[in-house]
Design a protein with these regions (language model features):
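Juxtamembrane/disordered regions of integral membrane proteins
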Residues: 1-133
Length: 133
C-alpha cells in the first residue's frame, strides 16, 4: 500500500503505516506546503491550500508510477532515495505550479523549492529521526 504524499511518501511511509496514515501524511504535507506558499505571498490561504492539494496529489500519483518502475533504486539507501525523490518532487510540483500560471517563473520555482525543503525536512525528521530507517 502506498501514500498520496509527495514522491517519497510512496516509498517510506505507506508500507509501515497503511492507508489511514498515508491520508494523514498527505494532509499534513498539504497544510505545511500551503502555509509556506501563503508565507511566500502566493495568494490567499484558500488558494494556497487548493494549489498545494493539487500539486501534492499530482506528485503523489506520478511518484507512485515512477516508484512502480524503479526497483533498482530501492536498495540505494534512505538518504539517496530522499535526494532522488526530493528532486523529482520539485520538478513535478514546479511544473504543476507553472501550468497554473499564477506567478512569474522565478517566483514559481522559488516556491516549488521552498515548499519541498519544508516537506522533505518534515519527512526526514519522521523517517530518520523518529522511525530510524
Amino acid at each position: 500500500m502506498y501514500t498520496l504524499a509527495d514522491a517519497a511518501g510512496w516509498y517510506f511511509l505507506a508500507p509501515l503505516f497503511g492507508a489511514v496514515a498515508a491520508v494523514g501524511f498527505l494532509f499534513i504535507i498539504v497544510i505545511l506546503e500551503a502555509l509556506v506558499l501563503r508565507g511566500l505571498k502566493w495568494g490567499s490561504l484558500k488558494l494556497s491550500f487548493v494549489d498545494s492539494a493539487v500539486i501534492n496529489l499530482t506528485s503523489g500519483f506520478v511518484g507512485a508510477l515512477l516508484f512502480a518502475f524503479s526497483a533498482p533504486l530501492v536498495n540505494q539507501g534512505t538518504a539517496f532515495l530522499l535526494l532522488v525523490f526530493g528532486a523529482l518532487t520539485v520538478l513535478i510540483e514546479g511544473g504543476m505550479l507553472t501550468l497554473l500560471q499564477r506567478h512569474p517563473a522565478r517566483q514559481t520555482w522559488t516556491a516549488a523549492i521552498a515548499i519541498n525543503v519544508v516537506s522533505y525536512a518534515f519527512l526526514f525528521v519522521v523517517v530518520v529521526g523518529i522511525l530510524r530507517l
